[in-house]
A protein has these predicted regions:
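Catalytic PLP-binding core of fold-type I/II PLP enzymes
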Residues: 145, 150, 163-195, 199-200
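Short, small-residue-enriched loops and turns at beta-alpha junctions
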Residues: 111-112, 137, 156-161, 187-190, ...
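Conserved PLP-anchoring active-site segment centered on the Schiff-base-forming lysine
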Residues: 96-114
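Buried hydrophobic positions in well-ordered alpha/beta secondary-structure cores of metabolic enzymes
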Residues: 23, 71, 89, 104, ...
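Conserved N-terminal alpha-helix of the aminotransferase class I/II PLP-enzyme fold
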Residues: 39-91, 113-121
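Conserved small/polar residues in nucleotide/adenosyl-binding loops
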Residues: 213-215
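N-terminal "arm"/small-domain region of PLP-dependent enzymes with the aminotransferase-like
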Residues: 2-61, 69-70
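PLP-dependent aminotransferase-class I/II
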Residues: 116-156, 160-168
Length: 215
């Protein structure tokens, strides 16, 4: 069943209805690190990615699986991956499309921690970040070359809250085969970046979604 109301998605999204053992409707917190395999063939298939299932908590955890599916449902996406922090999510998005020698074009309106990540950490990995003023979406195109692998922006930037022109920048990206990554931390309910052309959406979940309650 596909829910439409964001409150309902938050409570019941992600294909979870009840715990198969206790029938509890609350999602259990699985604290285990390891899982028992039915037999050697099952283990081989799981590690060979021929079957979907739990291997090791650092890779897959049933509690995280529900979280990932609910966030994906909230955004109208296909799937999601939960990582340790919002900054890890930003880095993960960029590092999955870039290698040393590549570049991305980012909005100048960014959370300070992301600016630090882009200017310092990624540069040490050989990834160049070019900054474009989003007031004119064409600025992204001006900084694009054959090594540009992604565009990056925040839907409602912290702290400026100047709304990012998602559709306009996404359209430019599609013309050049470049995906747009949107940090939707500030507006996960009122803004749906995927509907406006973004390819990837990320969140720092401890902010709007969890109201500063840590997972």
């Amino acid at each position: 069943m596909a829910f439409k109301n964001p409150e309902t998605i938050g409570l019941h999204g992600g294909e979870y209805r009840s715990d198969p053992t206790t029938t509890s409707v609350a999602v259990p917190i699985y604290q285990t690190t390891s899982y028992q395999f039915k037999n050697a063939d099952t283990a081989a298939n799981l590690f060979g990615l021929k079957e979907f299932g739990n291997i090791y908590t650092r890779i897959m955890n049933p509690t995280c699986d529900v979280l990932e599916k609910r966030v994906a449902a909230l955004e109208g996406g296909l799937a999601a991956v939960a990582v340790g922090s919002g900054q890890a999510a930003s880095a993960f998005c960029v590092q999955n499309v870039c290698q040393a020698g590549d570049n991305i074009v980012s909005s100048t309106d960014l959370y300070g921690g992301t600016v630090n990540l882009f200017k310092n950490t990624l540069s040490m990995q050989g990834i160049e970040v070019r900054f474009a003023d989003p007031k004119d979406p064409k600025n992204f195109e001006k900084l694009t070359d054959e090594k540009t692998r992604a565009y990056y922006g925040e839907s409602c930037p912290n702290p400026y809250l100047r709304v990012f022109p998602i559709k306009e920048v996404a359209d430019i990206g599609k013309k050049h085969g470049i995906p747009l990554i949107i940090d939707n931390t500030a507006a996960p309910v009122i803004c749906k970046p995927l509907e406006h052309g973004a390819a990837v959406v990320m969140h720092s979940l401890t902010k709007y979604i969890l109201s500063l309650i840590h997972i």
